[in-house]
């Protein structure tokens, strides 16, 4: 299947939504000075396209690519205002000139019209050689509505060429949006990873929580209180049909799809205490995994689909434990940072996890490297960092954090937001997995919680 066939299919999926919202914008907070410098030159175009660009009728391809590369934390894209000149073709590039700027990689591109379609072409150029060498190039003929997706696709190709790691710029995220809408205060939304193309999947006057993607990106599991108590929903995105409803007495929550897509882990308190369970999605059979009087919740799968990380307070305060679903006696603690540790999220390759660490009145996102045993704090400057979700390639992670809208905030004051519940704004934040690069996704008029990143297979 070509990327444009996939693009068309996903476009159909999202068009089932009745509600769409304004896009969010990424605001860099710090970290780009430590990244590899690269120049993305504005794409050349003919007069008709220039007119449309100036009137915001088509996407600025170069700006999207530059933002993608910068958001990864791996690259520092030189702002257009600082470009001393803008080459339009390979022969315009003077390697020694770019070398003096500390830049050895340049992206050139062009946009042209062919019939009613757009032709996007680009070159990735190595300026460390003299003469400069083209190390990657490609061309796409697309409809106008696919411009943004094509820009993300180019970013993926460039990122993989330069790092050897698959890009995630065509993936989607899901999250819960809370607004002051009297009728529908809670909304389950999806968007591009960068907050664009935001779409509402479900709206409710009662709380929605904990969305989780299926590995193929076709379904979302989430928690709803629409009936008056918590229920687990599995919803197909193509037609909005409800496939499964888990509604035992008391609490039903924290869904997590197994990487093989065959099982759903979740927590129930139907017997009084909160324990972990697994549903076989082909038979709907439910297996109890933990059985004790403590709180056991927030499961996250290891890549083998046989082991879970989860939060338990069996030691007195919440900590992260690991358990094999076929041997529930094999449970052991794996988090050791001071304070409490909870809400684990395992990387897709199983080499590390991120979690929420609470210590001395502060709340951070921390990382545990399973290969070295090293634990480190990634968001020391965030307020109430929560619910981390790792990108499919393990390079970035997303989390919710709080903007304190008062002059006593020790971090920063942001007055751009309105309709802020409880005077504070919960926003989406994006960070590199080493914690050196951070950005906020601004632009929503509500509080955003429970972000979750789709897999690499879930794109347009």
UniProtKB/Swiss-Prot annotation:
Top-level taxon of the source organism: Bacteria
Gene Ontology biological process terms in this record: cell division; protein import
Keywords of this entry: Cell cycle, Cell division, Periplasm, Signal
The keyword Transmembrane helix is annotated on this UniProt entry: no
Subcellular location: Periplasm
Signal peptide: 1-22
Coiled coil: none
A GO CC term attached to the entry: periplasmic space
The keyword Cell division is assigned to this record: yes
Principal location listed in the UniProt entry: periplasm
One family name in Pfam for this protein: TolB_N
HAMAP family: TolB (MF_00671)
Subunit structure comment from the entry: The Tol-Pal system is composed of five core proteins: the inner membrane proteins TolA, TolQ and TolR, the periplasmic protein TolB and the outer membrane protein Pal. They form a network linking the inner and outer membranes and the peptidoglycan layer.
Function: Part of the Tol-Pal system, which plays a role in outer membrane invagination during cell division and is important for maintaining outer membrane integrity. TolB occupies a key intermediary position in the Tol-Pal system because it communicates directly with both membrane-embedded components, Pal in the outer membrane and TolA in the inner membrane.
Family from the record: Belongs to the TolB family.
Protein name as annotated: Tol-Pal system protein TolB
